[in-house]
């Protein structure tokens, strides 16, 4: 049996900036952020995304959002496109994300759906 081909991906983790403005900036720019993401979601480039939280919410309490995480299906040659998308994203331009602390780690995805 041949080994399955592995897909090139980037695991992107971006913390929020510090400061009391961040929660409101995230809320205010959320609709624009989602609209900005739509093209990449539909093209199959952004395959997973969501907020990073301080802890899993309990008892109906709202989560404390500390940043964002996403998986991008992209080759090494597309890293420049990914960096531009991140820097132009409404969460970056509105002061939510701290791109200076971003971690963008390449990985090879062997399983995308459960077995």
UniProtKB/Swiss-Prot annotation:
Pfam families per record: YCII
Biotechnological and industrial applications of this entry: Xenovulene A is a natural product exhibiting little structural resemblance with classical benzodiazepines yet is able to displace high-affinity ligand binding to the benzodiazepine site of the gamma-aminobutyrate A (GABAA) receptor and could be potentially used as an anti-depressant with reduced addictive properties.
Disruption phenotype: Does not affect the production of xenovulene A.
Induction comment: Expression is significantly up-regulated under xenovulene A producing condition.
Reported function: Part of the gene cluster that mediates the biosynthesis of xenovulene A, an unusual meroterpenoid that has potent inhibitory effects on the human gamma-aminobutyrate A (GABAA) benzodiazepine receptor. The first step of xenovulene A biosynthesis is the biosynthesis of 3-methylorcinaldehyde performed by the non-reducing polyketide synthase aspks1. The salicylate hydroxylase asL1 then catalyzes the oxidative dearomatization of 3-methylorcinaldehyde to yield a dearomatized hydroxycyclohexadione.
UniProt name for this protein: Xenovulene A biosynthesis cluster protein asL2
Organism: Sarocladium schorii
């Amino acid at each position: 049996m041949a080994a399955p081909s592995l897909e090139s991906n980037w695991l992107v983790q971006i913390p929020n900036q510090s400061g009391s403005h961040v929660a409101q900036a995230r809320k205010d720019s959320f609709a624009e952020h989602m609209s900005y993401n739509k093209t990449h979601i539909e093209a199959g480039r952004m395959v997973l995304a969501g907020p990073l939280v301080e802890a899993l919410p309990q008892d109906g309490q709202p989560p404390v959002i500390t940043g964002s995480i996403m998986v991008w299906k992209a080759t090494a040659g597309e890293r420049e496109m990914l960096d531009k998308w991140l820097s132009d994203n409404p969460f970056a331009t509105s002061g939510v994300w701290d791109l200076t602390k971003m971690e963008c780690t390449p990985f090879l995805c062997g399983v995308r759906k459960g077995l």
